[in-house]
Amino acid sequence: LYASGLSMAAMMSLVFFGTLSLQCAINTFGQDIIVAHTAARKITEFFMLPFSVMGVTMATYCGQNMGAGKKDRIRTGIRQALILTWIWSLGMILLSYTASPWLIWLVTGSKNPEVLSNASWYLKTDSLFYFAPAAISVLRNSLQGMGDHITPVFSSLIELIGKVICAFLLARIFQYWGIIMAEPIVWILMVIPLIIKTRRLL
């Protein structure tokens, strides 16, 4: 229990520092971009809430079944959790492409074209990659439940390094487009070790 708590605390710390590095880069782009990004992030956090809920559920589910030696049930549970979160992702992609300006206005109360345009751009681009963070949440928590506290932290370390590089490299070259692409790039890199480790354990 202590190891699991320590591992989760380490993951959250790495995620926080990675997000902070991106925010520092965003703050250099001016007020309209800051407002747009803040609004888009709030909407994204709402869109991704089921991923977190499913992740917590899978940590408990996998822990119980690993203790009982029922790996077949873990495989089935992970598969079903991925399907459910991917179905949700499809819905959020559809919502991003049909209602982004309205959602952004709802959050900001702003009709500034630059705010609406950049925030919509963010949502439409990042939502196409929601399958990756859905898998990250499910697999990372499943591995925690199965007793692997190293791989999830390693995955979070990739997030930290990736966001720092994107903040100081992509953002300088591509401006806000670099920020928009930062998370999809990092998500794909993060999910790779989680998939490999899960397949090895099961």
Predicted regions located by residue number:
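Helix-terminus/linker motif at the lipid-water interface of multi-pass membrane proteins
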Residues: 13-42, 46, 64-65, 102-112, ...
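Short runs within selected transmembrane alpha-helices of multi-pass transporters and secretion channels
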Residues: 51-55, 126-145, 151-163, 179-195
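Hydrophobic faces of transmembrane alpha-helices in multi-pass small-molecule transporters and flippases
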Residues: 1-21, 26, 46-50, 54, ...
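Structural signal for membrane-spanning alpha-helices in multi-pass inner-membrane proteins
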Residues: 23, 49-52, 96, 141, ...
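Small-residue-rich hydrophobic transmembrane alpha-helices
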Residues: 37-100, 133-155
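Short alpha-helical transmembrane segments in multi-pass integral membrane proteins
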Residues: 1-6, 62-129, 170-202
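General structural feature for long, well-ordered alpha-helical segments within catalytic domains
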Residues: 2-9, 13, 17-22, 33-35, ...
